[in-house]
Amino acid sequence: VLLLTACGHIGNITPDSKVKLNPNKPVSLTVWHYYNGAQQAAFDQLISEFNATEGKEKGIYVEGYTQGSVGDLEKAVSDAVAGAVGAQSLPDIFSTYADTVYAVQKEGKLADLTPYFTKEEQAEYVESYIQEGYFHDDSSLYLFPVAKSTEIMMINATDWQTFADATGASLDELSTLEGVTETAKRYYEWTDSLTPDVADDGKAFYGIDSMSNYFIIGMKQMGVDLFDVKDGKLTIRADKEKIRRLWDNYYVPYVNGYFASFGKFRSDDIKTGDILAYTGSVSSSMYFPDQVITDDGTRDIDYIVMQPPVLEGGEHICVQQGAGMAVTKSDERHEY
């Protein structure tokens, strides 16, 4: 819990602070988050460890509460800010995305996190992760990254090898989106040929977890910001030729059966043997199956991790996404 370990650290940066914590009378901090299941258990364990060690030593006691889903958390925060009937009071710390932080800060409800970290400490993080917490009209840091990720390409290595041995396909061909599309077509035709008595029963090769990421990052790789925001105004730059290029490497292979999306996530489609590879969040690797389960039985598989494919001739750009944590403005003792 990075932000929790920073609790009290601000005192080292601002020694003239009048706040003095008392281990015998600890200050209580409330944290809202959206974790559930194993993630919630791990987060609760980190809080318990903090309370029993550094928190106990300094006089800080943290209580964590899940609000359910990301949407539930955003609504709880929005209701608290608006003072809606039945709403809870704002927590001291909450997990959030940049859009929610921006809305809350417009109401003047957030504390500046800049004093919590030295410039050297901030420099240890990916710059774009930190910069997301700053807003164009303010030099204060309002969102600190704690759960960021990018995208990767994951492949069922076991079944890929069978396909590669039979057709001469190479992993190098998967470095570009056009190469993935061509490989997916070849895979469909190859699997279709395995059952000559059944026409058009080829299998899909590839899937994409986030269509929005595909279009936004694809345009960026071609040098265009699909959503261009300047002075608070949004301009959609939908260059017809570039959009068509993205369309031809997304919609067309989906229609032809070369790409597919069946389950909620593409890792689900790997598990059922419906696809061989996909592009998704780094966090999705936790759910990549070690077995494929079909009507014909169950078989063990291995995996390959690669960088996501880039449009041929395009700039190597990947998405950065995920949540951070924000601290609400209250009093010196709770913000300390």
PLM feature spans:
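Paired acidic/hydrophobic, glycine-rich loop segments that form the ligand-binding mouth/hinge
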Residues: 92-95, 276-281
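Glycine-centered hinge/linker elements that transmit conformational signals in sensory
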Residues: 181-188, 229-263, 308
